[in-house]
Amino acid sequence: MIKLLQAAELAVENASAGKMSHWELFNNGGWLMWVLLLLGGVTIFIFVERFVAIQRAQRLDMHFMNRIRDYVVAGKVKEAIAFCHHENTPIARMIEKGLERLGRPMSDVQNAIENVANLEVSKLENGLPTLATIAGGAPMIGFLGTVLGMVRTFMDMSAAGGTVDMALLSGGMYVAMVTTVGGLIVGIPAYFGYNYLVARIEKLVFRMEANSIAFMDILNQPAQK
């Protein structure tokens, strides 16, 4: 154990003294570093693409439901459908489907709205399972690389005839630890990115539910007048 601690200290000293570049560290990490690099690229792509998609989905005219109410009360259903089609957001498409079902039982209208809402949420969540998998899998891949590197180091020590070469041991240790660092660099942003996107989607789902309730209330207004 003492020798391992000494090797770890020597590894830090060697890395600092040698001033190894990031590329050299990456290359010494082995083929698993290329896997982590690929996962990092996938993480960035999914996060940016989903962020933009959710940002677009949340854009909605603040007077949207007021205008829908005016159209419905005035009996201008076609104009209301055209307005929803023009807005082209998950909430608008949900209300548009409800407008297209007017004249049918209220339960059918509500079911149509719920079906569209479920479909829209499913679209928004596209790619999130992959992001969650990367968040959990990247650190494990990094740890696997470290374990393989340590096994290789001890095999080299064994082949050296039992003589502990601190330089060999320390060199193998810091190279092996590179994959753990790489796994965390990929996994941590993926974890926070996933939770951030999930929170944004949940907020949008709440707005969709609120607008759905408001729309169903609007449908009852003409009958009361």
Model-derived features with residue positions:
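Short juxtamembrane loops and helix-capping segments at transmembrane helix boundaries
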Residues: 162-170
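Residue-level signature of catalytic and energy-coupling elements of molecular machines
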Residues: 30, 44, 80, 95, ...
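Hydrophobic alpha-helical transmembrane segments of polytopic membrane proteins
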Residues: 173-192
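Predominantly long cytosolic amphipathic alpha-helical stalk/bundle segments
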Residues: 58-144, 148-163, 192-225
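Alpha-helical transmembrane segments of multi-pass membrane proteins
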Residues: 48-53, 188-200
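Alpha-helical transmembrane segments of integral membrane proteins
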Residues: 33-46, 132-139, 186-190
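Hydrophobic membrane-targeting segments
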Residues: 2, 6-63
